[in-house]
Amino acid sequence: MKLLIEKIKLALQKRTGTAQQKKSHDSWVAKGYRKEPTVTFVLQSHDKSLQVCHVLPKLRQYADAEIIVIDDGSKEEHTRRLAAALTGANEFLLRANDLFENVTYDKAIRLANGKYIALMQDDDDFDGTGWVEQAVRLFEQHPKMVILGGKGGLDITFEDDRKRAHGGASQATGDFCFVTSVNRAPMWINRQLFMQHLHHIDFRFAPFQFDDYELCARAWLCGLQVGWYDAGFRSLTAGGMRLWNNAFTQEQSERNGRLLYQLYADERDRIRQRVRESNA
C-alpha cells in the first residue's frame, strides 16, 4: 500500500510539474565536490555521534579533504544525528551494524578518493590541522612509506614459549622515525601504495585486534616503510568499546596473538633489519 501511495504521489508531481527542487548542472557544480582530494578522513563511530560532531568542524578546516564517517553502532538516534551533520559534498556516511573496525576500515579505504587516508576513532580529539599538514609533508618526503602512525610506534613482541605475538616496547623517538608497527589512531595510509601492494586489511583478524600490527609487518616484507610521528591526539572518552567488552577483547587478543605469531615469528629479524636500515 505504501508503495502504491508513493507511486501515485510521484505521478501527480510529474504531471503537475511540481518537484522538491529543480536540479541543474550549475547547482551540482556549486556543491563543490572534489574528485581527488589530498586527504580522506575516516572516522569509525560506535554510537558516539556527539563526539564525531564535535570534531567535524575541525576536520573541515583542512579544505582539500573528504570525510567518511562509519556509523557502526546499533542505535538509530546516532544514525539520524550523523546524517544531519554531514552536509558537505565531500562528506559521506557508511552504515554498518556492529561489524567493527577490521571490516569497516577496509570498506572505507575502497570508498576513499584521497591520496592519503587518516583512519580515526570516534573518541579522537585534536587542535587545528597541523597534524594533517605534517603527515602530508612526511609522505611527500618518504615515497616508500605506506603507513604513518600518530599514536604509538611499537616493536612487535614474539613470545616463543606461548607462541603469541603482540605490541611491544615503544620505538618512537624524536619528531619522526621508522618503526616496526603503529597502532590506531590515527593511522595514515598512502592509498596508492596500499592498493598496489597490501590490497586489504587481513580479514582473518576480524572483527578487531592486532590487524594494525599485521598490516605493518606485511608492509615491511613488501619492501615498503612504516613511520611514526606524534599527532598530539587526546581522548574524548574514558574508554572505547573495549571498556565494556573485556572478555571479547581478551578472546580476540588470544586468538589473533597466536595468528600474528604464526604469520611473522620467522620473519621478525628481517623486519627489524629493514627498520634499522630505514632509520640509518
Predicted regions, residues:
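A short, conserved alpha-helix in the catalytic core of glycosyltransferases
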Residues: 187, 192-197, 204-232
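N-proximal low-complexity "stem/linker" segments adjacent to membrane-targeting elements
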Residues: 2-57
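Conserved donor NDP-sugar-binding/catalytic core segment of glycosyltransferases
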Residues: 129-162
